[in-house]
Design a protein with these regions (language model features):
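Conserved beta-hairpin
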Residues: 16, 69-84
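Conserved GNAT acetyl-CoA-binding A-motif
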Residues: 116-119, 145-166
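Conserved acetyl-CoA-binding loop-helix of GNAT-fold acetyltransferases
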Residues: 119-124, 130-146
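Short, solvent-exposed beta-strand-terminating loops
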Residues: 20-31, 84-96, 144-145
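C-terminal "cap" of GNAT-fold acetyltransferases
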Residues: 166-178, 184-208
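Conserved acyl-donor/pantetheine-binding loop and adjacent beta-alpha core of acyl/acetyltransferases
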Residues: 62, 66, 79-122, 129, ...
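Short, basic/aromatic recognition patches
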Residues: 54-64, 69
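Conserved N-terminal entry element of GNAT/NAT acetyltransferase domains
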Residues: 1-46, 50, 204-208
């Protein structure tokens, strides 16, 4: 499927909002519109109101203009059909979703200079799922992260994939097909997930 992928910028704010108000939650109720505001580099240790779609929309506008939500939009025939939230892991440890659900995930690195990009969401329009859009978005994230000097890409797929709404980080098989390996399993009161990683730089012993 021939799509165009654009890195999210404030210029694309209108497209982003439209996607979340139409295709992203077409299978769900209006109350489910998240705008991906809980996965970002904002500091949610400061009390933040996520209580309604309208308040989450206001936060999305602020966060995108401030560069706190990062990721990529996929376009087909001029319309947004997919979204991947991808951000610097170390900068997102105080967002509300990490603080509430992800504290069992290992955040240590082999070196203080190691840079990891995390994939927090992969959302595809209902009529265009299973057509390779998610894989193309994921590959773009990997390519750009490598060019930006990141060492790893990391993601957190559920062990039991239910559906795109509840398992919004994508299935494990998607990541395995694209060079990721499991580096941790997390099972606690909130999660039953894999932590998967893909190296973006040659490691010692790798063949050039």
């Amino acid at each position: 499927m021939d799509i165009e992928i654009k890195k999210l910028t404030p210029d694309l704010l209108k497209d982003y909002l439209h996607f979340f108000e139409t295709e992203a939650h077409a299978d769900n109720s209006d109350e489910d519109r998240c705008y991906c505001v809980c996965w970002c580099s904002a500091d949610h240790r400061i009390k933040t109101d996520f209580s309604s779609p309208e308040k989450r929309r206001e936060l999305a506008v602020q966060y995108i203009n401030d560069g706190l939500i990062q990721g990529y939009l996929a376009y087909y025939e001029g319309e947004v059909i997919g979204w991947c939230n991808a951000n610097t892991k170390s900068e997102c440890l105080n967002c509300t979703s990490w603080l509430r659900f992800m504290t069992s995930v290992d955040t240590t690195e082999t070196s203080p200079d190691t840079k990891t990009k995390s994939v927090y969401c992969l959302t595809i329009a209902p009529g265009l799922k299973r057509k390779g859009v998610a894989a193309q978005l994921l590959n773009r994230v990997c390519d750009d992260a490598a060019a930006d000097g990141f060492d790893y890409i990391e993601a957190y797929p559920s062990k039991q994939f239910v559906d795109e709404f509840r398992s919004f980080m994508g299935p494990l098989e998607l990541y395995k097909r694209n060079g990721f390996t499991v580096c941790q399993e997390v099972k606690d009161k909130y999660n039953d997930i894999y932590v998967v990683r893909k190296p973006l730089k040659l490691q010692a012993g790798d063949i050039k």
